[in-house]
Each structure stands twice: as structure tokens, then as C-alpha cells.
Design a protein with these regions (language model features):
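Terminal alpha-helical segments
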Residues: 1-158
Length: 158
């Protein structure tokens, strides 16, 4: 029995797709993750807490998506991207982004923004998240990539 949520993600129009691994795009997403961290810092220093929250989340999402690009998985649905990464790497690796995703949604769609001190803490967590994914993705071997591709491909077939 496979993972029902992942199987659902494979059926979505813009859901999970197996593609060729793309090291160039993976690196570009990591660069964008770091750029988004800088944007979040600027927004925070300008007291723009809403956009700081959004930039923090996107820095994490770009770092996470760099992993998926590196192993050849495409997805335009954030929940499915996070789910696939959690499935492949473990829930611990996606705990931070899952927490921050909710805060980004609250800020962007409901105008509920945390206090500045909490957003500063989120930014520190995001820096660790991006750094961890940078190290993780940079250290992937061809064998690792093939193992991840094999695991996710099995879910598509189940």
C-alpha cells in the first residue's frame, strides 16, 4: 500500500511529475532561497512584517524545491512539494517549513501577522533551514539521486 496523499499529488494537474534531474535549476533555486532571506531581512528592518513573513517562507520553499529539482521531481503545488520531500527525507526535514507555511498563509490571506520578535525567530530558523538544504543538496551523489527517484517513482505506480 503506497502513500495515498502522494498518489493524489501525482494525479493533480500541476502536481508531482518525474523529470530529469536538473543541477543547474537546483543551484538557481538555492540562490533564490538565499536572495529571499536577504529580502526578508530588509523587509524586517523596514518593519514590513507581512512581506518579511512571506519572504521567509519562500526562502525555505526555494531551498526545498532545489532538492526536488536536483533529483528530477517537478511540482507546482507547495503542499505536494513539501509532502514529497518529507516522504523522501523524513518529517524532521520539513517541520520548519510546515510551521512557516501556515504563518505565511495567515499573513498573506488573512492579514494576521506575528509580532516582530516572533518573525525574527522565524528568520533565524529559515537561515538554518536554507543552510541545511544547501549542504544536503550539495552533497547528493548520483547514487543518492537514483535512490530518491526510485522511491518517489514507486509511489506514482502504486
Amino acid at each position: 500500500m503506497g502513500n495515498k496523499q502522494l498518489q493524489w499529488c501525482f494525479k493533480l494537474k500541476d502536481g508531482l511529475r518525474i523529470a530529469e534531474p536538473n543541477e543547474r535549476l537546483s543551484k538557481l533555486y538555492l540562490e533564490q532561497a538565499k536572495s529571499s532571506l536577504l529580502r526578508a531581512e530588509k523587509d524586517l528592518s523596514d518593519k514590513d512584517l507581512l512581506w518579511a513573513t512571506v519572504a521567509i517562507y519562500y526562502s525555505e520553499y526555494y531551498a526545498l524545491y532545489s532538492f526536488l529539482q536536483r533529483i528530477g521531481v517537478k511540482c507546482e503545488n507547495h503542499s505536494c512539494s513539501i509532502l514529497a520531500t518529507a516522504f523522501l527525507t523524513g518529517e524532521d526535514k520539513t517541520k520548519t517549513i510546515n510551521q512557516h507555511k501556515g504563518k505565511r498563509i495567515d499573513a498573506q490571506y488573512y492579514m494576521k501577522v506575528d509580532q516582530e520578535i516572533k518573525i525574527r525567530a522565524m528568520l533565524q530558523e529559515a537561515k538554518i533551514f536554507v543552510s541545511d538544504f544547501d549542504e544536503f543538496v550539495s552533497s547528493l551523489s548520483e547514487k543518492d539521486i537514483n535512490l530518491y527517484r526510485s522511491r518517489i517513482s514507486k509511489e506514482k505506480r502504486n
